[in-house]
Structures are given as structure tokens and as C-alpha cells.
Amino acid sequence: LSALWASLFHTTVVASEVDIERESSATFSQYNGNGLSFQSNNNTFSLRVRGRLQFRYANPGISQPTERADFEHNAGNQFGVNRARVKLDGHIGLPWIKYGVEYDAVDQRTLTATLSFEKYDALRFKVGQWKVEYSRERSVSSGGQQMMDRSIINRIFTLDRQMGASLYGNFDGPGAANFNYWVGVFNGSGRGDYSNHDGENMYTGRLQWNFLGESVGFKNSDIKRTATPKAALAIAGAKFKSQFTRFSSSGAGNLANFSAGEIEGQYDIQQFVIDGAYFYKGFNAQAEYHEKDIVDLADNNRETTLRGYYVQAGYFLSESISWWPEPLEMAARFGTYSPRDSEQDERFFEKTVAFNYFFNGHENKLTAEVSRVSLDQFDAEVGDETIYSLQWDVSF
């Protein structure tokens, strides 16, 4: 009888341990307005599922002109879903082992897929496909932008999404001794391409000095009305050989005036950017200056240097005008670049004004915008286009 009781007691203990283990590994879900979250009770796994829709009306419905012929194209109005994204993120195993996936439902392609190890602030590691931390403008999410689209210079100088690995971190020293850094090695063939084709990697680096003592993230609009000024200055560079001279979410391609590479590694490219950002009491400003040197190895080492810059600022006028609606921001941007060595031969200009009404920060906002892009050749304007747009961007 004692043996029977002992057996029953042992069975009960084992069953209790199994129940406890099951309970600790069980998952629970919640929705807080910023995605549907799932997390295990023992915190070994988490998943957040988010969606984002961007509805846009534009007249005319064209993208930013990149050559003279674009101004002569008669485009109709655009109305529809401009972006539809599904985002997954969370951690696995340990809270500092993080993953992220972003899927473009409009064009049916994976934009981002990363695995990150972020145990220490000063030393972190990431592998996968994502937007290279190069220029501030491109690193800001399209859902967090101040304007509907990035400036006209973005297409010329961005490294966009690449496959590779990166070390990065933040050194938070006393006073002005606050720095962020990123160094990476990538395929250099753009989104969705697993090969670098020519055996030459893309090498990148970015150093950001947060000289007012607090790290400045990749974001636009001072929605929170920063009480203490925040500012950053950064320099970044990249070096690679490729048959491509530009990158976008669609993948790799070539700029105007550059033919598709006849040989792998035809273009030897070195480029750099200097950028800055500032936030204080509803005011936000940022600017970038770019240079990009392209050597065509298949054309007697012909060298072309592209230059461009933009300045952008936004302000919640309610901070100065009592009757101005508190969620309404006014923003403006000026940008210019030359697609050729001789800046007097050809130069593009952009002038944009936008009004943002934030229902719930960048998670739910309405934007009205007027943007004028023009082209000068030999100091005479030969093309211009003014685009009127209205956009609703909502995340859930």
C-alpha cells in the first residue's frame, strides 16, 4: 500500500511539474493600438504583428522627374493604395535576440528580414536584409516621414536595402561624448539579390555625434515637443564595385546617363554624406550633403562626380500661435542635385511645402502637400512639374 501511495505521489509531482512547464511556456496575446502582440509567460518568445496602409491622391500622378523627358509625359491623376505593409518583430530565446520582417503587400516582395543581437548598447550585431544606415533621410521609415516622399536627391545617392552584416552601437559618455556608429559589409547588389556577382563587397560606415548628450534617432517631426534640445551631426561613406549605379526598394538599377553594366564590377563607386538633425519644442530640422564618385572601368576609367543636398524643417506653430491647432505641423524642403560633372550643364531643383495633421502621431496622420520639381540646363529652365497630393497614412 505504501508503494502505491508513493507511486501516486510521484505521478502527481511529475504532472504538476509538466503543468507548470506548460504554463510558463504558454503564450498570451494583447492589442494596444500598435500591433497585435504575442508573448510567452517565461519571456522566451515574443511576436508583434503590425499593418500599415497609405492612401494617396496625386495630381498629376507621377513620380519625381529624373530626366527631361519625364516633364513631357502627360500623366493622369493617381488615387489608390500607395503602400501596404505587414511587419513582424519580436525576440526569440532571449530578450536581446531580436528579429524583424517587413513585407510589401502592394508589390509582393520582402523588404526587410533581420536577426539582431543587442545585449550591449555599445556593441550590437545584425545580419540579413535591411536599409543600410547611411543617410538619415533614407533611414527614416516611410511611415515616419515629414513629407510624403523623400527628396529628389535620395534616388541618386541612397544605398537602400542590401544583404549583409553590421556592427553598431551607442557610446553614452558624459556631456557631449555621445556617439552612434555603424559599420557593415554587404553584397552590394540591392534588395532580393543573394549574390554580389563580381566578388566585390560593399563596405559602409557611419559615425554620428550626438553633441548635446542624447542619442538622436532616425525620425521626423517633433511630435513630443522635446523640452531639451537634441541634435546630431554625422558622416557616412561607402565603397563598392558593381554593374549598378543606384538602388531602391525595387532592387538595383542604373542612373540616367549610365548604361546597364556590360561587365560585372564595371563601376567603381565611392561616396559620402554629411548630415545633421535638430529637435526642440515642436521644431525639427535636418539636412544632407552628398557626393558620389563613379569610375567607369569599361570606358577608359571615365570619372563622374555627382553632388546634391537638401534642407528640410517642420514646426508645430501652436508652440507660438495660440489659435493654431496643436496636432498640425507645417514643413518645407528645398533640394537640388546635378546628374552630371558640370553643374552648370544640368541641375534639378525641388521645392516642397506640406501640412501634417497627426491624429495619433505617425501612426495615424493626414498630409497635404504641394511639390514643384524643375530642371535647368545652361542656367535656363527647360522643364517643371507641380504635384498636388493628399495622403492618409495609418498603422494598426
Language model: regions and residue ranges:
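Cleavable N-terminal export/targeting peptides
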Residues: 1-21
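Preference for short coil/turn "hinge" residues that link or interrupt alpha-helices
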Residues: 2, 29-31, 72-74
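Residues in intrinsically disordered, low-complexity segments of regulatory proteins
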Residues: 4-6, 95, 322-323, 391
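Outer-membrane beta-barrel pore domains
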Residues: 17-28, 62, 129, 227-396
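Outer membrane beta-barrel
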Residues: 34-191, 195-214, 219-221, 225-232, ...
